[in-house]
Amino acid sequence: MLEMLMQWYRRRFSDPEAIALLVILVAGFGIIFFFSGLLAPLLVAIVLAYLLEWPTVRLQSIGCSRRWATSIVLVVFVGILLLMAFVVLPIAWQQGIYLIRDMPGMLNKLSDFAATLPRRYPALMDAGIIDAMAENMRSRMLTMGDSVVKISLASLVGLLTIAVYLVLVPLMVFFLLKDKEQMLNAVRRVLPRNRGLAGQVWKEMNQQITNYIRGKVLEMIVVGIATWLGFLLFGLNYSLLLAVLVGFSVLIPYIGAFVVTIPVVGVALFQFGAGTEFWSCFAVYLIIQALDGNLLVPVLFSEAVNLHPLVIILSVVIFGGLWGFWGVFFAIPLATLIKAVIHAWPDGQIAQE
């Protein structure tokens, strides 16, 4: 048994390039695992740098210097963010306040509807269980106000951190874009010399991460706008807020779409009732989700589609548990990285001979 393990070890780990790749991966995972909180602004800056690299290169191709191309792209990007912050965010925030205000009425309607179930289906529903659920719901509503106050006070503590990030992140993005080659050369100098295999994996993953980040942003925008227009067509309350939530839900494959469907169905059901308008609105929402999953995602993420849905869900759960939001956001690239490493890893036949 021990001899078999030794043979397996020699086959898989006799190549110096494989050892170098393993060291780089373990070091990278360890740094992110232990210092993810401290590295949050850097991770945001790296994501934005990947996103803005394409327009920067395009401006360079028409004669702009790297410095000027970076400056122009960053100014335009910040301008778009400010426009969204002053136009979209206040409306979505106001709709969120209205939703919280109307939630007790919605829950009361749900409680009244649930109270009729034991009379309609006495064999399936117990009145005592329904009453207990209604009482539990009322008690939660009474404590909701205190929870909102506590969250508000806690959020005040994070305002300083957010203010610092708003200054640091654009500066980091600027220097990551402007001095990209110098920084990559500096990283190469500290890596092991036998890094041919690592370079092969990096070249493949670098392009995939670029496509993934650009694709995710485009998917969020397309799905969010399409959902908003669909909800506006039916005059659904809180349409912009719900559309923003649906847009952000694409960051979490499968799970996000399932979770965000709950408030969409709840709001539509309480506004329209279980009538034709509700089912028409819900059908439009399902069509948008189907087009996203079966048309938009295959076009934007052709490589990721090769991953089995169970692998994607497990990746979201595992990496999300390890690194929170960033683990969820990069679940598909990380799963693709593991797949690329497995495929690129030496099979050991040369070493055996």
UniProtKB/Swiss-Prot annotation:
Principal subcellular localisation of the protein: membrane
Membrane topology: Multi-pass membrane protein
Segments forming a coiled coil: none
Statement: the UniProt record of this protein carries the keyword Phosphoprotein: no
Subcellular location: Cell membrane
Entry's Gene Ontology cellular component terms: plasma membrane
Residues annotated as transmembrane: 19-39, 72-92, 156-176, 217-237, 240-260, 281-301, 310-330
Keywords linked to the UniProt accession: Cell membrane, Membrane, Transmembrane, Transmembrane helix, Transport
Top-rank lineage group of the source organism: Bacteria
Family per record: Belongs to the autoinducer-2 exporter (AI-2E) (TC 2.A.86) family.
Name of the protein described by the UniProt record: Putative permease PerM
Annotated organism of origin: Escherichia coli (strain K12)
